């Protein structure tokens, strides 16, 4: 009888393809331009996952058929953003964010063109970048009318950005935490089609919001099941009571702070 045996996870050996990709990561970057786009795509994914994608590498590997880019751990600059103009098939984009880059690493001018010609874009994350302004969001909404997820916490947006976002009738998830929005902006956001489509809303750390915002959300966002409004010092117990009255029974995630 065997006692005390323990199971250990078995390490899977790398495939030949993975080994070849690891070797390809080591070749001179100017050789990347001669690679087929399918191989460029795999190299791009591997390097971005490792946070090894720089402006130089980006310039050689980016191509028009790219559909997903997760750059949150990559150190690129305005020059790298320029290369994104060719990615007309892009569906998912996560931009670099602090502390990997400085919050002012990307200028408003470079970000203004981010949504041009990207009608297929569904998910975009621009968290922590002060270059993200109302103008940038307006341009993004104009070029990407089918956006479903927008993550723009800790940016420079105001209520004007929420007015633009209110036009995204397919918007399901919105993160606008730690911004200078107010009750008026929230009311403008949820009073239209967005109120019917939103499933997740994160407004944590928005110090200008009051109970009026929570009331608007509870009345208008009929399908909401994730709501985060912790660290909002102007909210009172009334907000929690409103959520209990209208939404608590259907919530999957709910966070708030008692002051």
Stretch-by-stretch model annotation:
Residues 17, 21, 25, 44, ...:
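Amphipathic alpha-helical interaction motifs in eukaryotic regulatory proteins
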Residues 62-64, 85-88, 109, 116-119, ...:
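Inter-repeat linker/turn residues at the boundaries of leucine-rich repeats
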Residues 1-75, 79-82, 87-89:
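Cullin-RING E3 adaptor/co-adaptor recruitment helices
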Residues 34-41, 128, 154, 205, ...:
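Short amphipathic alpha-helical segments embedded in low-complexity Lys/Glu-rich regions
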Residues 67-71, 93-96, 122-127, 147-152, ...:
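Conserved hydrophobic beta-strand positions in leucine-rich repeat
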Residues 1-6, 16-19, 160, 171-176, ...:
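C-terminal capping region of solenoid repeat domains
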């Amino acid at each position: 009888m065997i006692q005390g045996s323990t199971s250990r996870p078995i390490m899977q050996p790398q495939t030949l393809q993975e080994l070849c990709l690891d070797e390809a990561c080591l070749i001179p970057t100017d050789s990347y331009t001669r690679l087929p786009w399918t191989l460029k795509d795999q190299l791009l994914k591997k390097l971005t996952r490792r946070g090894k994608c720089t402006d130089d590498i980006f310039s050689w590997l980016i191509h028009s058929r790219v559909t997903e880019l997760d750059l949150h751990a990559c150190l690129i600059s305005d020059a790298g953003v320029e290369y994104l103009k060719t990615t007309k098939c892009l569906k998912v984009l996560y931009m670099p964010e602090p502390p990997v880059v400085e919050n002012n690493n990307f200028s408003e001018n470079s970000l203004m063109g981010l949504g041009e010609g990207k009608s297929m874009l569904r998910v975009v994350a621009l968290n922590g970048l002060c270059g993200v302004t109302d103008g940038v969001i307006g341009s993004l909404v104009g070029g990407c009318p089918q956006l479903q997820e927008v993550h723009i916490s800790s940016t420079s947006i105001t209520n004007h950005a929420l007015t633009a976002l209110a036009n995204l009738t397919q918007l399901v998830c919105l993160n606008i935490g730690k911004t200078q929005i107010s009750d008026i902006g929230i009311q403008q956001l949820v009073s239209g089609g967005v109120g019917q489509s939103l499933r997740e809303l994160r407004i944590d750390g928005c110090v200008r919001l009051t109970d009026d915002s929570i009331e608007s959300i509870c009345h208008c966002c009929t399908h909401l099941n994730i709501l985060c409004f912790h660290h909002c010092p102007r909210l009172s117990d009334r907000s929690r009571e409103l959520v209990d009255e209208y939404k608590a029974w259907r919530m999957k995630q709910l966070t708030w702070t008692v002051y």
